[in-house]
Design a protein with these regions (language model features):
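SF2 helicase/translocase NTPase motor core
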Residues: 1-166, 240-249, 253-257, 264, ...
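Short glycine-/polar-rich loops that comprise or flank the Walker A/P-loop
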Residues: 61-62, 86-87, 140-141, 164-167, ...
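Structural recognition of the conserved hydrophobic beta-strand(s) that form the central parallel beta-sheet
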Residues: 119-122, 166-173, 344-346
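Residues immediately C-terminal
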Residues: 126, 144-151, 159, 176-177, ...
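Conserved RecA-like P-loop NTPase helicase motor core
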Residues: 152, 310-429
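Post-DEXD/H (motif II) to motif III coupling segment of the RecA-like Helicase ATP-binding lobe
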Residues: 154-213
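Short, flexible/disordered intra-domain loops and linkers
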Residues: 179-185, 293-301, 402-415
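Conserved interdomain linker/interface between the two RecA-like ATPase lobes of SF2 helicase motors
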Residues: 193-281, 285
């Protein structure tokens, strides 16, 4: 007699890669705790569900709880759970829609009249009283999985994680929280240390988990208004970095303000026009926008990009944002895959696990000095898809304006880490020599030739 439906069963059509097998062995060797640090697109979800299936076979696991940062990730997890014969309760939004069902199935599991329960929830629901009141009744044989686990290092979320559940697995391409060592430590203290192997982008490409790519840095200058704001913010960031009594959130707020300014730099629209004029025949293109607005016109970058592509260039596009409903997202994905839509103009969707593997070309207009966002945005474009042999990436890089000596030193230190990531990404590209030559200009300007 086979494993009953609703209980984790490894699918016959899935073959784990060697690094996934190694990660699973590492997690079991660490007594059922640990954080998987694996490149975006390398199969963290499948690895986690494989762990659940093995725990069911060896330990009699009773409950799987998956915590995701966003609603769309709940539905993506549900799709993968279906492949493992699981029937998850999707616990998010109104408690009326899921609370009584969780209570009922939890009672059945505890009374041994039901073998297994799967619950997929969001960070927002995790901290709610309705979910917390249920968590305390989850049995000892429960596995909690934190997807995009870096988010769970925030104080309120970390405090909401159940301490009585001892089987814990964190998933993140970059578990280190940006300018928040305390949050990173709390996160790894809860889920467990980063497990071997740490799978880099290069490893994932070599293993065939991600496709190869060509990389084209596109340099953009700030206009006069943006340059003044940039210099002022950089000066304040310098003060915040030197101050002993600074609050981490003060520095983060300044860095975010400057990132939004850079992300929405008005000259990026001209750069986009220049690139796309010769690419109007292409399809499967993602335009990844900042959520900021032009400092002079106050127009959101998303609107300016849609206007340029659709009205001016006649490129068939639609928007894909956090506000797009789940059903509308599915419709857009289908139109995008078929080529009916040539492009998607998006905000944030590359940052947290949105799965649109049909992307073959991407124009990244949003700028981020957050290492996690940098890795996620570029790694997600490299997901394999039938007929997709390689990807093409146009990456807009804003050139900092002329700054005074003191501010220049701050800028140089901040830029060094960011430029290191651009260089690493260029080095892995199929056109590495060409891409590195373009970046050399920036390295020379800032005296960073040692990168």
């Amino acid at each position: 007699m086979g494993i009953p439906w609703g209980c984790p069963q490894f699918p016959a059509d899935v073959q784990l890669r060697p690094y996934q097998e190694t990660a699973i062995r590492s997690w079991f060797a660490s007594n059922g705790r640990g954080t998987l640090k694996m490149a975006t697109g390398s199969g963290k979800t499948i690895t986690a569900l494989a762990i659940a299936a093995r725990l069911y076979e060896t330990l009699g696991l009773q409950v799987l709880v998956v915590v995701c940062p966003y609603r769309h990730l709940v539905t993506q997890w549900a799709r993968e759970c279906d492949r493992f014969h699981l029937m998850p309760i999707l616990a998010f939004e109104s408690a009326r829609q899921w609370q009584s069902e969780v209570t009922r199935q939890l009672y059945r599991v505890r009374s041994h009249s039901q073998r297994f329960l799967t619950v997929i929830t969001t960070n927002a629901t995790l901290i709610s009283e309705s979910f917390q009141s249920q968590l305390r009744y989850f049995p000892a044989k429960t596995l909690i999985v934190g997807d995009e686990a870096h988010n769970l290092g925030a104080p309120r979320l970390e405090a909401s994680l159940p301490r009585h559940i001892k089987l814990r697995l964190g998933l993140s391409a970059t578990p280190e929280r940006y300018f928040d060592e305390g949050g990173t430590d709390a996160l790894l203290d809860y889920f467990g240390a980063v497990l071997k192997p740490e799978l880099t982008l290069a490893d994932a490409i070599r293993a065939g988990a991600l496709v190869r790519y060509t990389y084209f840095p596109v340099f953009v200058n700030l206009n006069e208004t943006e340059s003044r704001h940039y210099a002022l913010l950089t000066h304040r960031i310098g003060w915040a970095l030197q101050s002993d009594d600074r609050e981490p959130e003060d520095l983060t707020a300044l860095l975010m303000r400057r990132a939004r300014l850079v992300g929405a730099a008005s000259n990026k629209i001209a750069a986009l026009r220049s690139v796309m004029r010769s690419r109007l025949h292409t399809s499967h293109t993602l335009f990844y926008c900042s959520d900021g607005t032009d400092t002079d016109t106050d127009e959101p970058q998303l609107s300016a990009v849609v206007r340029l592509l659709g009205s001016e260039l006649g490129y068939r596009v639609n928007t894909y944002t956090a506000e797009t409903s789940i059903s509308e997202r599915e419709r857009l994905r289908t139109q995008f895959e078929s080529g009916e839509l040539q492009g998607l103009v998006a905000i944030r969707c590359l940052d947290e696990g949105v799965d649109v593997p049909a992307i073959r070309t991407a124009m990244i207009l949003a700028s981020s000095r957050n290492p996690r966002q940098f890795v996620q945005r570029r790694g997600r474009i490299l997901r394999p898809h039938p007929g997709k042999e390689r990807a093409t990436l146009f990456d807009t890089i804003v050139l900092p304006p002329q700054l005074d000596r003191q501010t220049w030193d701050v800028e140089r230190n901040l830029l060094k880490k960011e430029l290191q990531r651009f260089v690493e990404f260029a080095d892995l590209a199929e056109n590495a020599a060409e891409a590195r030559l373009k970046l050399l200009k920036l390295q020379q300007r800032y005296g960073l030739l040692d990168i």
